[in-house]
Design a protein with these regions (language model features):
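Solvent-exposed, acidic/flexible segments
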Residues: 12, 16, 71-78, 201, ...
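Boundary/entry segment of secreted carbohydrate-active catalytic domains
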Residues: 1-14, 191-197
Length: 484
């Protein structure tokens, strides 16, 4: 799949029109699904990436928060893009933010207990009245699609009191508790931002279910990318996903974002949701990140250690970069450009995991923003489309059959794919994070000629009578040897 956006997409692009025109081109390249950004109105209007959720029923149809369209276009353009993707044989996964709401029109006075933002286990004051923007009336929509309005009692907590305007403080509403079965950072990580939905409320669960069915009926989407799942009670999702799949009448693909570099916690979460969704392989991303910044001193033989790709491949969505890890973003941990061809070879040419290509890695981009140090930076991310297209071709033509691994060297690793009945030609992948490398590997094809699909090495390689050969790669590079 491709994540078809990054944080700094220009609103003038009209992303929905852009993807509509490129649907067949993407299919021809080898993409079978796109993860599209949040399609509903955010409190930031035209400039909202989609995660400051305001009205999930407004797909760019109503004049709310200063705009009819979203950052990516109008409802009609969104639906036309989905239709074009489906016509090209590409599935669509909708980015879905269920955790919070932001940008309410009306204030309400309610009793709440203050907590330090960084310690959700111990109150820092007495329960008192606060004034919060917790009434969501959606005046621009005027009850179309849903007449549900959000009030303070639908939320657990907020982070703003209009009476005191005290910073770094959360306010837990009286009679509420922070949701259980969530991440344990800060004592309890149920609260992330805005008005935090109370998933212990039946009214909230019913409304989220109604919206999910409406969204599927409206868009015909083939699955969900679920945002910020570590902030939502894990017990909520199995039943919700069952209802969504039953309503859609198809086996919707679902991947959740649980951002934590801890394989044991990801195993716990997958078990907690009864294996009903995949999750992003965050530990693999961090392995790529550290390898790319180690100057050739990373143990490449351990690149898959502690990852879902290695330990739970059927539930792993593998990725190199995303909109949160890209430079200047909240979870900034960018993989260095020189290493990205190696990382993409790992996720695209092995049999484990469901790989996700990042828009900015494919097309490249430039943008400016402020860093965490307060300084403004200009960022240039180069396009890796040429090499990714080569890898996608190799995946489609050669990544079949038995896989033999040669993760037996500190710098140079490789693996081979022997092909199957329908795809009889073999492939050998070799990479090094340091000096040029070579490796004796079996491809099961005696006396066969192999050439480097990446064109990094021009001379062909021939296997011996037992189907083995010494395959080579340049330093800090990857070569993909395919049978002629």
């Amino acid at each position: 799949m491709m994540q078809y956006f990054h944080w700094y997409i220009d609103p003038n692009l009209i992303l929905w029109n852009d993807v509509k025109t490129k649907a067949q081109e993407l299919a021809d390249a080898g993409f079978t699904a796109l993860w599209l950004p949040p399609a509903y109105k955010g409190m930031g209007g035209t400039y909202d990436v989609g995660y400051a959720v305001y009205d999930m029923y407004d797909l760019g149809e109503f004049d709310q928060h200063g705009t009819v369209r979203t950052k990516y276009g109008t409802r009609e353009q969104y639906l036309a893009a989905i239709n074009a993707l489906h016509a090209s044989g590409i599935q669509v996964y909708g980015d879905t933010v269920l955790n919070h709401r932001m940008g309410g029109e009306g204030t309400e006075i309610a009793r709440a207990t203050p907590f330090n933002e960084y310690d959700r286990l111990h109150p820092k004051g007495w329960t008192r009245d606060i004034k919060a923007y917790t009434h969501f009336k959606f005046p621009g929509r005027q009850g179309k699609y849903s007449n549900f309005e959000w009030h303070w009692w639908h939320f657990d907590a907020v982070d703003y009191d209009d009476f005191t305007k005290e910073p770094n403080t959360l306010y837990l509403f009286e009679g509420k508790t922070f949701d259980d079965y969530v991440a344990l950072e800060k004592g309890n990580f149920a609260y992330l931002m805005g008005c935090d939905l109370d998933f212990q409320s039946q009214d909230v669960r019913d409304e989220v279910t109604r919206w999910g069915k409406w969204y599927l009926d409206t868009t015909g989407a083939d699955g969900f990318r679920l945002d910020a799942i570590k902030h939502i009670s894990s017990w909520f999702f199995p039943q919700w996903l069952d209802e969504m799949r039953y309503h859609a009448g198809k086996d919707l693909f679902v991947v959740g974002e649980y951002w934590l570099n801890n394989i044991d916690t990801l195993h716990w979460y997958i078990n907690a949701v009864n294996g009903k969704m995949s999750v992003f392989d965050v530990p693999l991303h961090y392995n790529f990140y550290y390898a790319s910044r180690s100057g050739g001193h990373y143990d490449m033989g351990s690149i898959l250690n502690g990852t879902l790709m290695q330990q739970r491949p059927t539930h792993a969505v593998t990725f190199v970069e995303n909109h949160d890890s890209q430079p200047l973003q909240s979870l900034e941990a960018p993989v260095e450009p020189w290493f990205k061809p190696l990382a993409y070879a790992i996720i695209l040419l092995r049999r484990e995991g469901y790989p996700c290509v990042f828009y900015a890695d494919y097309y490249g981009t430039e943008y400016e923003d402020y860093g965490k140090d307060g300084n403004r930076y200009k960022i240039f991310l180069p396009s890796h489309r040429w090499i990714i297209d080569k890898l996608l071709y190799a995946r489609k033509q050669y990544a079949y059959g038995d896989q033999y691994d040669y993760f037996d060297h500190y710098n140079t690793i490789g693996w081979t794919r022997l092909g199957d009945h329908a795809h009889p030609k073999a492939m050998a992948v070799i990479m090094s994070d340091s000096v040029p490398g070579y490796k004796w590997m079996e491809v099961g094809k005696p006396n066969a000629k192999f050439y480097d699909l990446t064109e990094h090495i021009k001379e062909p390689i021939y296997t011996n009578e037992w189907g083995w050969a010494e395959f080579r790669c340049n330093g800090g590079s990857v070569s993909v040897w395919v049978q002629e």
